[in-house]
Structure formats: C-alpha cells, structure tokens
C-alpha cells in the first residue's frame, strides 16, 4: 500500500518542480513546461494564457493558436481555460530516442498582435519499457582448456528509457563454474560478461544452462531474461585478434550504395580449421542493420543503403571475429557521416491572411512563414526574400519565422490577385533554393464611381415610333467588383410640355436601355434633354451623370395644306378673274401651301394637273404662281378650270390638289353680262332671284362710288403733294413718316378693295362679293377722319337653272402667317416664277403709300380713266392681306358709271405715257353690250 501512495506524491512534486521551472523560464523571456510521457489526451501542460497575460475568454478574439514545424501536432490549446494540453499520447522514446533530455519547441501565435512566443516543453521519461534482449536463446561455446578467469561477452539488453528507468543491472542464475561481471563503457553503457570461475571438463559436463536477467531502476522495476546454453568444446587455445581495438571512418552522406568503407582483418595463430575466421556484426541496432554490409569471409564493410546525415550522423558498431573453435575477437567501428548540401530549404506558410483590403495600411501583416533546412552548418543557413517588384516585403520574426507585410497601399483595380514568389536559399556550395507561391487576393472597396465613355451622347429616333421601342443603350463601367460594380441607371425627373419626363422616356435600371413610352411627333417635340445617372451598389454608393440629347427625326406624315385659295364651306369653287387684255406672264393668282413637316419633307413643288384650256396657264414649280402662258384671246372661254397639285419631297411623297376657276373678263359688269348671257334652264323662281341680285349689285356699286368720291374730296388738300411726287418722275421728296402707316396697315387697305367672284364650276350658283372701302382711316394716321367699318355684300347669280340653295365663300384661315418666301408674288406685269417682295424699310413703305394716294386722287378726275394696263392696279384673284400693292384690284375699270359713256382709267397710264390697253377693250365690249 505504501508504493501506491508515494506515486501521487511524487507526481505532485514533479508538477510543482515543473511549475517553478516554468515561472523561472518566463522570467528569463521564454516559456518552459514539462509533461510526463504517455499521458492521456487532453492532459494539462501549462496555463499559457496566464503566462502570456491574456484573458482565457478572449483567446479566440486574439487569434491565439499553436504552430509547430512538425507534421504531427503534439499539443493543443484549450479555448475555454487557456491551458496548453496534450493533443494525443506522447512517446518520448519515439521522439527523442536515447537523448538525455527530450525538449519539444513549439510557438504560440497571437494573430491580432502579429507576435510569436516560443514555448519549450520537456517530455519527462517514465518507466514504460522493459529491457529487451535481441535473442531469447544464446549459445556460448567454451573450450575445455579455458583457464579460470576467462571472459565471454554476453548480449546486452536494450531499454529505450533513460535515467533511472533505463537498464541498471544484470543477474546470472547461480552455478558453480561461471560468474557475471558487468563493465561500464565510455558512453555509460553496461556490458555483461560471463566469467569462468572453475576449469571445465567436457567429459564431466559437456553443457551448462544459465539464465541472464536484465533489470532497470524504475518503480516498479522492469526486467527481461535470456537463456544461455554453454557448450564445452574441444581444445582450441587461440582466439582471433584484431590489430586495432577501434576503427574510425568518415563518409559523405551522398555516397552511393556499394561504396566500400574499409576492410577489417583478425588473425588466428591456430592452424587448419581452427585458424579460419568468420566476421559478423555483434552490436548493431535495427536501424543500422540495413545500412551497412559486412563480408563474413573477407571482413569488407560497404554501404548497403543511402545514408542521410539529417537522420543520423554517427554510427557505432562492434565487429566480431570467430574461429571454428568458437574463439572470439572483437573491435569497434565508428562511422561519422559528413553533411553535404543535398536538402533544399523548406518554406511552410504558417498563416495567410487573404483576402486583404485594398486600403490596408502599409505594414499590414499578410502571412507568417516558417523556413527550415535539414542540412547543417552553412548548408542549413537560409536567406529568404521575395521576387519581382511587388508591394510586399519579408521581415524577420523570431527563430526561423518570417512575416510578409505590405510596403504601400494596394489597388485592386490595377491588380486583384498577387502571385507572390518567396525564395528561400541556403548558403551551401552550390546553394539550393526553393520557390513558394502565395496567391493573395485583394478585397475591393467602393472607391470608383461608374463612368460613361463620353460625357454626352446624341440619339435619334424617327417620329411615329412604336410605344416601348428601344431608343438607345447606355453602358457605364465601374472598375470595382461584386456589388461595388453593380451599376443601376436612372433618368433625372423633369417636365416636358407640362408633363413629367417619365411619361415620355423610361430606362431599364439594369441594362441602361432607353425606351420610348409614347409615340413622338416631330411637329410637337423635336428634341429632349436627358440627364442619366449611373450609380453603383456600394456603401456608400457612388454615381456619375451623363447628358443625352434625344432628337426626333421628321417623317413625311403630313400632306401639304393649301392655305390659299381657301376651300369654301358650301362645296363651291372660288373664281379668279383675269382681264382679256392680260399679256403672257400675267399673274392670275398664287396657290399658297404649307407643310408641317421639315427639311426635304417640307419642300413643296406645284404643277398643273389639268386645265380646261391646255397651254393657256402655267404654274410656278416652286412659287405656286398661276400665270398666263400666252396672251388671252377673244375666243378663249369665259370660264377656265384648273387643277393644281402641291407635292412635297418626302419618301413617299404626299400631295394635295386644289381646283381653280378663272373667269376671263375685263370688268365685273362684263363678267356679269357674259354669265347672264348663258342660257339657263327655264325656272321662274331663278329668274326673279337673278333680277333681285342684279339690282342689289347695282345699288351697292353706286354706294361704293359715292363713298370713293367723298373720300377723294377729303383728300383734295393733299393733292399738290401727290402731284409733286408724280412730276419728280417717280422720285419721292421727303414726306414725313408720321403721315403714313406701316406695311400691315397697307395690307389692311388693300383688303378693303378685295373683290371675290365665286363662280361654282359644277353648279349654277355663283356670288359676287363687293367689300365696302374703308381706306380713309388706314392711310391717314394723324388726321381725324371718321372710321367706317367695311361692309361685305354677297349677291348670288344662277347660271342655268334657278335653285333655292346658295353658298358663300369662306375667308382664308387667319390663324396662319406666311414667311417672306410664302407670300404671293408680284402682279401680272412680271413673268416666270419670280416672287414679289414686301417693303423692307421706311422709304419703300412711304413710296408705296404715296403711290396709293396718287392713284386714289386721280380717280376724282372725270377725264381720267382707270383701265387696267400693264403695271396698273389690274384685277387680280382673291386678294387677301398677304398680297402686295401690285395686286390691288383695279375696281375703276370694272364699274360702269350710269349717265356716262366713259370708263375710269388708271392714272398710271398717263404717267407712263402709254395708252390704256384695258380701256380699248372695254369700249369694244361696251359696243357689244349696246348691240345686245
């Protein structure tokens, strides 16, 4: 019972000593522990968290872990208690063999501090191995002539334990002839020898049986036995003898197998068979047996297997020479293995912190490396460095450890993965090196906004597009990765024509494709300005803007619109008047059209599709002016029908047509007379209605002439000013601008003289419109003349049958305004497609007004005529406010004055010195009327 109680106390004493030793070593700067071998897994070794000054509960947070160079992890860290424990069963003999002290060095890594702490653990031997003989039965041959005191070596027992637990003693079973003597060698080994105490007599006893016991000093002690059979031989009194008791050999570790080391020779003075010697290894362990080979006949020793200095650098063995008489001779062989640089340095990545943020500070630890070379001396000295010009460097840590740190800031957009080559080279000759690749990933941060290739774009879309049609595709590039590079697109909200921009355009937030939500109309919207924003999904998100100009392209989707002549509302066709005295190139009327399209789609051309009298009229290709292609003849019909087409230049082209009816007559009464001379159908209702219309027209004409006479009387005091202008030959003297009104008022004045004869080509209805003149207030801006409202009287005429229904020509649409190029051209005195121009300065305006005043004043002269000659105010077609002075209707030559056989002629004819052409024509026609 005493032995079991003493063992726990001794264990406690050992742990106490180990703890005191640990504290002492900590004070010296290194942590040391000790632990007995063969302890169970998880056995306590030491409180490393306390020794490092760390809180056991925060070990995981600090990243504390055990690192060691060996492949087998012997120790582990208890994360709860912070204690160093065994990771498994530890066999001291396997780790350190026969070394007096078994020390295991490990390292403790504190990752958050980037530090390594060395820990030295001593494995304490326990008596867990029995002394063991290599054989269980041993045969010893002794010659009978052996003298007392002769010694015979016995096999040694091997105990892997050390200290007191190792082999301590041998015991021999009791007998009368032999005793046991134990010798202690230079290395501390004990060698048993069998000593002959009494002379042998083979004839008395030929064999002896002994038992040899080997015991260690453990508690309790362990032992093993071997049986010894002693055979007494006949006389052979000389044993083999080696010339040297010890042989020493040095050999390089890279010597190939079969290399001869040396040859040993033992001499035996006996003759014959008793002098023949056989050689063999006597003391050799299991590891040495396959490495060396001994020729038993010659004594030659050679290498049987490649040597390795790193495994074992020194070998000790005994060579035994034995003759046939069982006489033995012994010698020792000591082999020293010399190191050669045959091992490359080994680099082990202990810890790698990947990925690393691209904004990490310089000096950030990337990895811990362990470098080791199994060679010795300079062959085992290693230098470590990195290849290429990379932003990393190696720093020396404790022992053979290095840490890889950054030298500067990283940029993932330039390099996202670094292949770091770590070179480890020894100092041997020649030096050996090792390359180790470390793949380091750089983690992205959101440091780049999305960017467009261009700051602005222009896109085009045809009008009348389909809803949902794709317009344009935008792409922004973000050099970041993952969510930092996920780009979303948006359009900044705005208003367009009072509506939100999002009702016209939408953008796919993922692809950046723009879509049209509405069908665009070029005539309403011609361009849109968009601000597109590209944002990434980082935290915080980054964005950039780009301006997009979206232009709507015109299509030929609008046909030309005819503004003049305006289409009547009753279905009738307006009648344009042309005097029979008109020469070639006389401007009859002008077709005015516009196209709401633009560009080529709005270029208009005019052409004559159909005419009742081919070759009589022509239409200007670009102006739309209807002119006489030749002089009018008496044989030409009174009513001419023209169909004019207006066509744009789109693809395909669109067109519109208008039908014009031209009445060929020198005066309005002549028109009425000739219209009345047509044979209408007999209808009593139509005849009475025609009579009423004729009377109404005559009455209105009289009132109009009376109003003109009164107006001319009021303007008589300015007559001398007008005559001065005429006598100067067309050159105007300075007339104050304040006496005249602008161009728009001149147009209004011209409108007061508008006369429209609407003759329906396809019906028997027509009506003649006489506007009441109101030019007094139009021309005088400073005089207090009374302003008269214009009176418009409409009279219908029946051509063939009297019908109850009648219509009135609608005036032109006043909503439209003409540009300078769209205004009607000059009078019939001009030829071709030339267009007239509006007065563009004050002098031209005053001159125009003076001519109007002069013409009006000449009407008061009874001897003067108002015939429509060239350059006079001849009768033109449908005069609106857009016509120039040359289109003012010459109402004087078309009005018959009762009680006088003279007709009013244009005073301009007198000034020009020309005979009034229109006057002669009127006289002839008057004669015809008298005959009728």
From Swiss-Prot:
Signal peptide stretch: 1-29
Domain of life: Eukaryota
Biased composition (Polar residues): 810-841
Subcellular location: Cell membrane
UniProt GO cellular component terms: plasma membrane
Gene3D superfamilies per the UniProt record, alphabetical: Cadherins
All copies of domain Cadherin, residue ranges: 30-133, 134-242, 243-347, 348-452, 453-562, 570-682
GO molecular function, one term: calcium ion binding
Membrane topology summary: Single-pass type I membrane protein
One Pfam family this sequence matches: Cadherin_tail
Membrane topology (Cytoplasmic): 714-932
Composition-biased stretches (Basic residues): 922-932
Keywords: Calcium, Cell adhesion, Cell membrane, Glycoprotein, Membrane, Repeat, Signal, Transmembrane, Transmembrane helix
Primary localization class, coarse: membrane
Sugar-modified residues: 47, 414, 419, 545, 685
GO BP term, pick one: nervous system development
Region Disordered, residue ranges: 804-841, 902-932
Ranges that cross the membrane: 693-713
Extracellular side: 30-692
Biological role stated in the UniProt entry: Potential calcium-dependent cell-adhesion protein. May be involved in the establishment and maintenance of specific neuronal connections in the brain.
Protein name (record): Protocadherin gamma-A8
Source organism per UniProt: Homo sapiens (Human)
Gene (UniProt): PCDHGA8
